[in-house]
């Protein structure tokens, strides 16, 4: 939304939820993966999104580079998927030991979630916005108001998203 706002396309916006990367592991966490650096251990098969494709891939690369693990993890990457949902498939088919994925996708999954500390992780505040050139500005604003309402945010929360603001992530 920042790019659209810089071009004057956003009439108004409000922060709503967080998009957060986490590590998905098999039930019971058989390799005892507890932190990002564990993904560089010998023999750990890692799945990530394609860094030139889906947002989860570019975010994972950015996070791993920032934490200093991007080069060290290369030999462990067994797949770079074209979609975020493929990461869940690779994990469920035991084609990878760990995947870097959005935490909300793990909410209704049999996989276990390993949180990445905020100082190493990727946390992004996701807003709702309306467009300056909307053909139906009143309806657009009504929808944005609903999304940002307690009821709208409750739907996001029900599906595994952390609601903004939270003590856990702050302003990210």
Where do the language-model regions lie?
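Exported/periplasmic ABC-transporter solute-binding proteins
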Residues: 1-172
């Amino acid at each position: 939304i920042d790019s659209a706002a810089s071009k004057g396309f956003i009439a108004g916006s409000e922060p709503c939820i967080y998009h957060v990367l986490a590590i998905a592991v098999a039930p019971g966490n058989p390799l005892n993966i507890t932190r990002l650096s564990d993904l560089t251990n010998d023999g750990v098969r890692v799945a990530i999104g394609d860094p030139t494709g889906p947002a989860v891939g570019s975010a994972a690369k950015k996070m791993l580079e920032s934490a200093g693990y991007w080069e060290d993890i290369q030999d462990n990457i067994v797949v770079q998927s074209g979609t975020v949902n493929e990461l869940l498939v690779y994990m469920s088919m035991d084609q990878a030991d760990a995947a870097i994925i959005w935490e909300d996708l793990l909410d209704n999954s049999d996989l276990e979630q390993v949180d990445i500390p905020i100082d190493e992780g990727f946390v992004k505040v996701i807003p709702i916005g309306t467009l300056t050139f909307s053909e139906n500005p009143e309806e657009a604003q009504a929808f944005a108001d609903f999304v940002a309402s307690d009821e709208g945010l409750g739907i996001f929360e029900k599906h595994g998203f952390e609601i903004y603001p939270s003590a856990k992530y702050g302003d990210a």
